[in-house]
């Protein structure tokens, strides 16, 4: 197989990375690969703790695709078994454990989502439950003998919890060993992960060496900050943009990020767009609004199509720039001829509770036919022409009495 030059490969592989352990070893593996004509095997694992992948996952998936574009082979591991342990990386307390059924259910759609980025024909998909689930207790004891408690406490999250006298469960020590056994089983050449995975990647490297296998090169990628601009992107923190979001939601969420994140998002999520990326970067200082809109369009286009991106932008402008209701609102016919505004908002699902409905009215985020509602005690007449209720920025309802 013909590969690009070693320097061309290194230029693409090192782009956007945080750390490579080590660059010299990576170069040696690339040279050997070029001489033999055999592609390197590049491993990436994803625990299905939630059913949806999000743009935070796309950062490492995009790097895996970079390797594929250079002619190398991707191995995507669905961590059905490790998800039952719960990755302690970056956690201040023990993570809830998933059942085998929950992990399998969540992981079912991961591959379909991942191939929005990866080349499916050049990707091996596997579940680590296949080999980790087959290990005996004697195997686990032998595996555990390769690492000490002192080594485990070297990782920051364990050390901080130990000093704070927060409990650390024994099964949490097994997580990096289990992930490391993935590398022993697969004999991969390179493993990718976020910066929070560095310890786990190094354990895999050590275990490969212990088992007489050439140690993997470890490559860490930046963690994508969520749309709130504060924490790592996570579905549990409600700051994520998911692969399965609709084009409209994906565009709107992308536009909601702080201006300070436009460059980071663009570099990490749009590196494949070349000239378009450079144009976005050149606009950030002079016109961040245009830069952010272009960024959001390209994100949607990447996961759907340019046409879907244009439609999502048009939808956003109609709702939030021109403040018009969508054309396709379903008419909801209510039994009552009138209703207190608080009750109406909760009935429609615009507010989860009466107290939240009051808060929305107080914040002046409720209107009926473009007229702001500021009175908690307002009673809304429902007879006659249909009315458009707007609650917050994104919720619209078309209502009338039966």
Swiss-Prot record:
GO MF annotation: an example: ATP binding
Keywords assigned: Aminoacyl-tRNA synthetase, ATP-binding, Cytoplasm, Ligase, Nucleotide-binding, Protein biosynthesis, RNA-binding
Pfam family membership, one: tRNA-synt_1b
Endpoints of the signal sequence: none
Catalytic activity: tRNA(Tyr) + L-tyrosine + ATP = L-tyrosyl-tRNA(Tyr) + AMP + diphosphate + H(+)
Gene3D superfamilies for this protein: HUPs (3.40.50.620), RNA-binding S4 domain (3.10.290.10), Tyrosyl-Transfer RNA Synthetase (1.10.240.10)
Entry GO CC: cytosol
Ranges spanned by the short sequence motif 'HIGH' region, renumbered to the chain: 48-57
Broad EC category: ligase
Record EC number: 6.1.1.1
UniProt-listed GO biological process terms: tyrosyl-tRNA aminoacylation
Family note: Belongs to the class-I aminoacyl-tRNA synthetase family. TyrS type 2 subfamily.
Entries under PANTHER family matching the protein: TYROSINE--TRNA LIGASE (PTHR11766:SF1), TYROSYL-TRNA SYNTHETASE (PTHR11766)
HAMAP family per UniProt: Tyr_tRNA_synth_type2
Record's protein name: Tyrosine--tRNA ligase
Organism lineage: Bacteria, Pseudomonadati, Chlorobiota, Chlorobiia, Chlorobiales
Gene: tyrS
